[in-house]
């Protein structure tokens, strides 16, 4: 959020730009009592580049073979199941809270300092499930040490075609991903925005760039300035609502 704040208050010369994931823009301000910038007014959206989906995974020894079975287990053992996250307020923590709310289950959140320790405890059976970005989980999924029950994208991933979406699994509303975009200061001139937009568009048409992004499980989702502004507003509203419903206190 420090970098985002710096760009929000930077000169509009086109040299101070923010390449960012969605968290600092649409989650961070909603978790702060005194945010230093506003997602809707502090930036000039330039381009959305893509989104990285996330998996909900369980230990391979977990009896749940489907998302429905995990939900049934959570309802049968109300308040007993535990889920891990890389920390309070991370995008995947809020995805897990959104899953909890949409599936009407009661579970215990166990926050860690990073995804590595969280995954280690999931592998060790200390927690029951977690949601994490696809690139971090795919090696364990493909090796069989973790079982993916659902993916947050609108369609199945080619790298894990047997894993259904949340909607296919009976839990709609989880079509969310970690998005990446390019932003500038709010008063960045339109001609500068257009030059940068065209440069991003051209690069995303490069075959090598596309392959590199696909190898990192980035689903290219190119959108121009006005579309990005609407997307950011919608994304911010979703996480604000999730934070309120989950009773997560801003700090």
Stretch-by-stretch model annotation:
Residues 1-41, 80-82, 104-133, 140, ...:
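N-terminal (or domain-start) structured segment
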Residues 6, 11-14, 50, 66, ...:
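Conserved functional loop/turn residues at catalytic and ligand-binding sites
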Residues 9-15, 30-117, 166, 179-212:
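Hinge/capping helix and adjacent helix->loop/strand transition within the periplasmic-binding protein
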Residues 19-20, 86, 151:
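Short glycine/serine/threonine-enriched helix-capping/active-site loop
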Residues 51, 137-205, 234-237:
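C-terminal lobe and pocket-closing loops
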Residues 101-105, 142, 168, 190-251:
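An extracytoplasmic/periplasmic, membrane-proximal ligand-sensing/linker region
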């Amino acid at each position: 959020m420090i970098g985002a704040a710096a760009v929000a208050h930077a000169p509009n010369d086109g040299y101070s730009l923010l390449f960012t994931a969605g968290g600092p823009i649409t989650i961070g301000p909603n978790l702060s009592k005194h945010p230093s910038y506003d997602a809707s007014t502090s930036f000039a959206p330039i381009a959305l580049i893509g989104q990285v989906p996330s998996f909900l995974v369980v230990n391979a020894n977990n009896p749940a073979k489907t998302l429905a079975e995990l939900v049934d287990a959570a309802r049968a053992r109300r308040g007993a199941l535990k889920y891990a996250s890389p920390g309070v307020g991370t995008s995947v923590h809020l995805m897990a809270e959104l899953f909890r709310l949409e599936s009407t289950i009661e579970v215990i959140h166990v926050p860690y300092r990073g995804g590595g320790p969280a995954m280690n405890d999931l592998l060790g059976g200390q927690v029951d499930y977690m949601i994490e970005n696809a690139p971090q989980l795919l090696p364990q999924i493909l090796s069989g040490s973790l079982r993916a029950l659902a993916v947050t994208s609108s369609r199945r991933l080619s790298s894990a075609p047997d894993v259904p979406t949340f909607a296919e699994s009976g839990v709609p509303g989880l079509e969310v991903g970690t998005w990446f975009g390019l932003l500038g200061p709010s008063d960045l001139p339109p001609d500068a925005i257009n030059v940068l937009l065209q440069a991003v568009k051209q690069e995303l048409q490069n075959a090598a760039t596309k392959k590199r992004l696909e190898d990192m499980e980035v689903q290219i989702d190119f959108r121009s300035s006005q579309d990005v502004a609407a997307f950011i507003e919608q994304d911010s509203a979703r996480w604000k609502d999730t934070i309120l419903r989950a009773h997560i206190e801003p700090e």
